Amino acid sequence: MAPNLRKSHPLLKMINNSLIDLPTPSNISAWWNFGSLLGICLATQILTGLLLAMHYTADTTLAFSSVAHTCRNVQYGWLIRNLHANGASFFFICVYLHIGRGLYYGSYLYKETWNTGILLLLTLMATAFVGYVLPWGQMSFWGATVITNLFSAIPYIGQTIVEWAWGGFSVDNPTLTRFFALHFLLPFAIAGLTLIHLTFLHESGSNNPLGIVSNCDKIPFHPYFSLKDALGFMLMFLPLTTLALFSPNLLGDPENFTPANPLVTPPHIKPEWYFLFAYAILRSIPNKLGGVLALAASVLILFLSPLLHKSKQRTMTFRPLSQLLFWTLVANLFILTWVGSQPVEHPFIIIGQLASLTYFTILLILFPITSALENKMLNY
């Protein structure tokens, strides 16, 4: 009998073990679809980004015009740009849902997979930030100025780091050029990290909604989950194309239709919606260094999740108190996102401060306490 090429060829063997014959828990729900959705998001962003880069000029005098030229004169340039800009939003929606799934079902107990995932998130945030600067509109310019300027809060070396990052004494041509270079490079770093992420995942196998060992009941990835993923792709591309075709500027800032002008500050500088929760946490602390530390902590706190897991059960499936806390955290993140988009005025300041405090309290204090309480309740 001839050997099966799929199982004997060095390259096909790897693909086979990762995507075809991979033993998968039979009960994983739609919450396990987001990994593959993130993969397809990355592929789409790299493809549309490559096509956009072919028509883009990384120069302060030409950047804004080159983007306008792409939208007006390049065949389907408007569509490629709209898919790329809104694709970023869908990327972040998927990433936040993916992290939420990980927190809810205790997937963070696969420490290596979880830690590489956080590195992926940080790289993704950096990529999105430098990419937002490229169209060189007002919000691009001022967003770049405000966020890079935060590094000056680092004692002693801060100002030097900022001027080094800028390539001068303000955000200017060198900044735009290096941001373009980074925006081109980082997605490939994300792709590389994704492979590491998957390597660690396949070392342990997938978690499942019950959080129990599922070795006795696994099914091949193909055709069951390959088909399920294909359905997921369709359900994501439908709203993405709808948004890109019918309301492409819904999530953007109108300020970015004005070319960058260092002499005119926009009335309200704010990042894209997917960074607003962190921006709200940054603004909630009146001290610059304190704000920067809180901003960093808002994402880096995820590294502590495996250490703060005190429950005897892995998932929250059978833990109603932790569930209540989890959904309170989700609601709190929505409040932070909303506050981040509002001006720094009376009700919003205190709401932002309370929401920021709640965010850290739930993650650092209430989750472990509730877990311990639920452990006690198991004895009765």
Curated annotation (Swiss-Prot):
* Membrane topology reported for the UniProt record: Multi-pass membrane protein
Q: Return the GO cellular component terms, semicolon-separated.
A: mitochondrial inner membrane; respiratory chain complex III
Q: What does this protein do?
A: Component of the ubiquinol-cytochrome c reductase complex (complex III or cytochrome b-c1 complex) that is part of the mitochondrial respiratory chain. The b-c1 complex mediates electron transfer from ubiquinol to cytochrome c. Contributes to the generation of a proton gradient across the mitochondrial membrane that is then used for ATP synthesis.
Know the name of this protein?
Cytochrome b
Q: How does it assemble?
A: The cytochrome bc1 complex contains 11 subunits: 3 respiratory subunits (MT-CYB, CYC1 and UQCRFS1), 2 core proteins (UQCRC1 and UQCRC2) and 6 low-molecular weight proteins (UQCRH/QCR6, UQCRB/QCR7, UQCRQ/QCR8, UQCR10/QCR9, UQCR11/QCR10 and a cleavage product of UQCRFS1). This cytochrome bc1 complex then forms a dimer.
| Gene for this chain | MT-CYB
Alphabetized, the UniProt keywords read: Electron transport, Heme, Iron, Membrane, Metal-binding, Mitochondrion, Mitochondrion inner membrane, Respiratory chain, Transmembrane, Transmembrane helix, Transport, Ubiquinone
How many and how are cofactors bound here?
A: Binds 2 heme b groups non-covalently.
Compartment annotation: Mitochondrion inner membrane
Single GO molecular function: metal ion binding
Residues annotated as binding heme b b566 are 98, 197
